Amino acid sequence: MLVIILGVIGLLASSNLVSSSTSTRVGGHLPLTFDPPENELGYWYTYVESCRFCWDCEDGVCTSRVWGNNSTSIVENDYVKYCEVSRWGDQCRYDVEEHIYYTMNCSDPKPWNPYKIAKEGVEKG
């Protein structure tokens, strides 16, 4: 009986460890945040590179947190936006400052920029 109880406790403990370790990888759970985990910055940067969490800005000059000092610096401007990102299972969601959320499959992500779409629409009209 004691062996069974210890076995159940072991299973519960290992499942808890697995779920906590997957929460920091793409595919696990990430509550809505302006500041995703450091190890996911490269993922989010690929699809919404204008997000403020991708940039270290000091005195109006911003350097990529993903590429570090090896990257080209930019002057802080309207391009650098506050973004929210979240993930539940394989559904990733992001918003570029407008509360118009874009949801995508985390394993098949697509870039989306509402500002670029609006600009293209104006040019065509």
Swiss-Prot record:
Residues carrying sugar: 69-70, 105
Pfam families, sorted: v110
UniProt entry tagged with the keyword Membrane: no
Residues spanning the signal sequence: 1-20
Superkingdom of origin: Viruses
Recorded coiled-coil stretches: none
Keywords: Glycoprotein, Signal
Listed InterPro entries: ASFV_fam_110
Stated role: Plays a role in virus cell tropism, and may be required for efficient virus replication in macrophages.
Family: Belongs to the asfivirus MGF 110 family.
Protein name as catalogued: Protein MGF 110-7L
